[in-house]
Structures are given as C-alpha cells and as structure tokens.
C-alpha cells in the first residue's frame, strides 16, 4: 500500500517492485525486479516457482572413504548464507573451507577425479566468488562470461 500511495503522489507509468520470490503473487506492480529466476538457487526451488535451476558448481572428487567422498569445493567456492549446497546424487555431509564431504546414494558409483555438480543454496554470493561462468549444454562448453562481482 505504501508503494502504491507513493506512485500515486509521484506519478509515472511504472511501479517497480518485488523479485523472483514474489513474481507469482505480486499483482499490483507493473514491473517485477526478478533476476535470480534466470539461473535459480535452492532457496527459490523450495517455492515451487515455474523456473528450473540452471546454475551448478562443477567440482572433482579428490578422495574416497568408507561410504563418503570428498570434492574440491567448499566454503570459499559457495555462498553459504542460505545453507549447504545440494547434491542430486546423494547428501552433503559437511562443507569445510576448500572441500565438501558427500555421502553418495547407494546406487551411485563415484570414482576419483570424477566431475560432479553441486547445486548452490544462494546464487549471488556463489557467483561473486568466481571470475568466470561457463555456459554448458550437457557436457559441452558453449560459451564463457567474465564475472565482475569478484571481491564485492
């Protein structure tokens, strides 16, 4: 109501408000400031919005133990303010500075040096920790984009 009152006082054709998380319920804004929908993160997947997650952190398996594996990506590579990343092939057990310990699902056969994809819980701070984003189609690299959010 406050924003609608301000728009009535100031005038103009555009009332810009909201974001990805309210894009499906905001009926009064004429422009939605939805940005995360493009790549998604686990927070928005929980809202059951009509967008599919399209960002992953690719990493490699460094070691194997009895019932667990360790990947070469941890707190320094992931935005952790919304919790642990998700791993579709199993469960995330623990994230340390540079590694993530994972428990594979029983049917998974994970090998050393195997590349896996972690699903970031929060997109923005994860992207800000990297210098390049890679656009892939399956396993093929299609393009790359520099990231200018580093060190923000």
Where do the model's predicted regions map?
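Active-site loop/helix belt of alpha/beta enzymes
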Residues: 1-49
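Residue-identity detector for glutamine
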Residues: 9, 33, 43-45, 53, ...
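Generic structural signal for short, flexible, solvent-exposed coil/loop and linker residues
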Residues: 21, 27-28, 46, 50-51, ...
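C-terminal accessory subdomain/extension
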Residues: 64-152
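Internal helical hairpin/lid segments
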Residues: 36-85
């Amino acid at each position: 109501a406050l924003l609608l009152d301000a728009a009535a006082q100031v005038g103009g054709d555009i009332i810009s408000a909201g974001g990805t998380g309210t894009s499906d319920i905001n009926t009064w804004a004429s422009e939605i400031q939805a940005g995360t929908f493009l790549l998604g993160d686990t927070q928005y997947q929980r809202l059951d919005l009509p967008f599919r997650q399209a960002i992953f952190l690719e990493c490699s398996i460094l070691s194997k133990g009895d019932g667990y594996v360790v990947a070469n990506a941890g707190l320094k590579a992931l935005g952790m303010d919304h919790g642990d990343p998700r791993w579709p092939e199993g469960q995330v057990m623990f994230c340390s500075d540079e590694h993530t310990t994972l428990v594979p699902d029983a049917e998974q056969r994970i090998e050393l040096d195997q590349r896996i994809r972690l699903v970031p819980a929060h997109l923005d701070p994860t992207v800000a920790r990297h210098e390049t984003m890679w656009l892939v189609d399956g396993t093929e690299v299609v393009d790359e984009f520099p990231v200018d959010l580093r060190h923000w």
